[in-house]
């Protein structure tokens, strides 16, 4: 009987962690495949099938009650499946967009897609963690793969410099993160989020616990590019291949924020609800992040650097919701991450198509994109949808995403912070709409790259991904029932139901 029970438990654990295991094992298979069939053109499409298979698994789990597997190390079902889906959608779109891009720059290495699968496996583990050890393993699995992907173009000095910076600063932040976990464990005697409250109540080392929380947050705030731990972001985004930059900007941030939501909701946030000091600290970080991200993006002529500083500001918007510290706010944060992923996948996808024009020139500056909207209307129109949505114009998804993070802040008494967020969003319209002005209204100079080569073709697969992201942003905005259903799923049937 005991053997039968143990066997059933093993099967249940394997089924619960199927997405993570499937992605990791498939990554190994792709590497072996590439050894014998170097640069096989089928590799990216096999990677897409793997990611699609993992997504199908998570779709069927959306309606399941939240539960844990592998000794309660990983969560499955409900909101955990939703977070996994957002990550998997980002990975799938990034792979599809990477195929023509990497072929054009002659860096379509087979290991790229294996590394994306490894990174995605780590992201899913991170976003569904229920234990600090799982958080660390997922975080490092994700990070190591991203370090390598950043330096993919080995002949590009900028890419190699970016990879080295990312690795060194990432390792430095991991030290803070690990030390914080060690102190939190020493004070509470547990690594599980849900057991922190009971361990904290009987601890004589409560001040030590809060020192650990501070170090833990330093490590996490680096991963989400919050001020003052943001300076690595522009260089890494500029140096890395553009489609992979989009992957880093969306999937990794979704995973890191999802893990932070779980830690706050089940652990730190339950310990001192009447104190609010940790909430004030997060509110101040959110304030500085939103303001600095938008200010630094203002005068950027390089579009990738502008999007990098923009991503810093958007991290601040999510932190506004986390500072509110309510179930409604956490639901809004996760919902915003879905909108953010769609906006940035599309924005970086358009940039990837324009960045390399098939000649020698690399198109990254605003001036090099002058008048491209009329020459490539599909890219011009979809670019407009993404820029308007990033600004927060109704009825696009970006507007409702920001509403989902600002409204809980007002309800939690952080009206001043929500007002700053709204003003910053209005302020951001300047640099977002400047891109559209250049796209549609500025005449190209004779020596501009875009003027020299407007005849490049847009791959059909890339068009489907970019148009799909734009349509989803419109659907989410124009069909409020879908938005309300998603928010209620988290606020009532999702986060509240977690073990």
Give the role of each language-model region.
Residues 1-499:
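Alpha-helical transmembrane segments of multi-pass membrane proteins predominantly involved
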């Amino acid at each position: 009987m005991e053997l039968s029970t143990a066997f059933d438990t093993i099967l249940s654990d394997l089924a619960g962690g199927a997405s993570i295991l499937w992605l990791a094992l498939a990554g190994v298979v792709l590497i072996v495949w590439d050894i014998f069939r170097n640069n096989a053109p089928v590799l990216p499409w096999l990677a897409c099938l793997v990611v699609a298979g993992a997504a199908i698994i998570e779709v069927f789990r959306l309606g399941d009650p939240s539960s844990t597997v592998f000794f309660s190390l990983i969560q499955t079902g409900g909101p955990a499946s939703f977070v996994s889906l957002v990550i998997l959608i980002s990975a799938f779109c990034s792979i599809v967009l990477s195929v023509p891009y990497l072929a054009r720059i002659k860096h379509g290495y087979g290991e790229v897609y294996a590394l994306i699968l490894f990174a995605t496996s780590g992201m899913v583990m991170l976003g569904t963690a229920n234990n600090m050890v799982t958080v660390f393993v997922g975080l490092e699995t994700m990070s190591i793969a991203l370090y390598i992907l950043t330096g993919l173009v080995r002949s590009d000095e900028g890419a190699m410099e970016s990879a080295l910076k990312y690795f060194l600063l990432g390792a430095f932040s991991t030290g803070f993160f690990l030390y914080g976990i060690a102190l939190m464990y020493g004070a509470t005697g547990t690594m599980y989020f849900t057991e922190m409250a009971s361990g904290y109540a009987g601890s004589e080392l409560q001040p030590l616990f809060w020192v650990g929380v501070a170090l833990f947050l330093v490590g996490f705030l680096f991963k989400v590019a919050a001020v003052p731990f943001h300076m690595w972001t522009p260089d890494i985004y500029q140096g890395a291949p553009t489609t992979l930059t989009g992957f880093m900007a969306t999937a990794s941030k979704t995973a890191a924020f999802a893990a932070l939501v779980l830690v706050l909701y089940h652990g730190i946030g339950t310990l001192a609800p009447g104190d609010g000091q940790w909430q004030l600290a997060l509110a101040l970080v959110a304030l500085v992040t939103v303001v600095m991200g938008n200010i630094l993006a203002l005068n950027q002529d390089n579009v990738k650097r502008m999007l990098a500083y923009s991503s810093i500001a958007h991290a601040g918007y999510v932190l506004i919701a986390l500072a509110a510290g309510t179930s409604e706010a956490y639901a809004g944060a996760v919902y915003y991450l879905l909108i953010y992923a769609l906006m940035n996948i599309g924005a970086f996808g358009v940039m990837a198509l324009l960045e390399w024009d098939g000649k020698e020139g690399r198109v990254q500056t605003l001036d090099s994109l002058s008048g491209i909207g009329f020459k490539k209307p599909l890219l011009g129109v979809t670019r407009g949808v993404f820029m308007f949505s990033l600004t927060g114009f109704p009825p696009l998804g970006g507007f409702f995403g920001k509403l989902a993070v600002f409204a809980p802040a007002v309800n939690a008494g952080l009206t001043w912070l929500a007002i700053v967020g709204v003003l910053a969003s209005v302020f951001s319209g300047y640099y977002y709409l400047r891109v559209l002005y250049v796209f549609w209204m500025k005449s190209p100079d004779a020596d501009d790259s875009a003027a020299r080569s407007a005849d490049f073709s847009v791959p059909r697969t890339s068009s489907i991904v970019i148009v799909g992201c734009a349509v989803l942003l419109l659907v989410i905005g124009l069909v409020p029932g879908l938005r309300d259903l998603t928010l209620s799923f988290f606020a009532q049937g999702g986060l509240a139901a977690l073990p």
